[in-house]
Regions:
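Bacterial N-terminal signal peptides
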Residues: 5-15
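N-terminal Sec/ER secretory leader and immediately downstream segment
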Residues: 19-94
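Short, charge-rich amphipathic alpha-helices with coiled-coil/heptad character
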Residues: 88-117
Length: 202
């Protein structure tokens, strides 16, 4: 039973030790630096988008294409091909359509990214609460083990509960590590599609 207690504490401590690497973002659980939103200048070197940034939603065809290109289930090579086909068919409207398309991608992917970041921070707060609870129950288990006479039924019940809560904690921790990659993947997708759009404009 002592081995169980030590194992539980090791798992909980390893799952929470890396949090708050940046004091500005105490709920950020990832080893990757938190970048709250993508800078337009970092992904777009084309003509200014000021006059089109709020207009892309008015174009049904562009809105539908933005939705398809933004979906992570659409492979990047397929998305790049769709961009090229759309702009090749745009003829004299190519520059205007290119700007509208990128404005839509920028808005949509930035919004997706914000949702992922907010979700990660929500889970991080839940994990912190779960870790505190597991620590409390581990101390309670240790106290029970030192009581004479021993209440073996109560010790077993609390041990089983700790095992269950620790398993959930571990599973969430693994999911968080996976989801931490998503904002970077979105950044890369936006940069790649922006580059293709700019190349097709030339």
């Amino acid at each position: 039973m002592r081995v169980l207690v030590l194992a539980v504490m090791a798992i909980v401590l390893s799952g929470t030790a890396a949090r708050a690497a940046d004091p500005r973002y105490p709920d950020w659980p990832c080893t990757q630096a938190k970048v709250p939103e993508i800078s337009l200048a970092a992904v777009w070197a084309g003509p200014p988008l000021d006059e089109v940034q709020s207009k892309w939603k008015d174009h049904a065809k562009i809105s539908a294409l933005v939705a398809k290109l933004s979906a992570r289930k659409t492979p990047l090579d397929e998305a790049e091909k769709l961009v090229k086909e759309f702009l090749a068919a745009s003829a004299s409207d190519k520059t205007a359509n290119a700007k509208l398309l990128f404005a839509g991608l920028f808005d949509t992917l930035n919004a997706q990214r914000s949702q992922v970041i907010n979700g990660l921070e929500r889970v991080s707060r839940k994990q912190r609460e779960a870790a505190d609870k597991i620590r409390e129950e581990t101390l309670a288990l240790q106290a029970l083990q030192g009581v004479t006479p021993r209440d073996d039924a109560k010790i077993e019940a609390l041990s089983n509960e700790l095992i269950w809560k620790t398993r959930i904690f571990e599973d969430r921790h693994k999911v968080v590590r996976f989801v931490c990659e998503v904002p970077t993947t979105i950044d890369q997708r936006l940069f790649a599609l922006g580059r293709v759009i700019q190349q097709e404009m030339e």
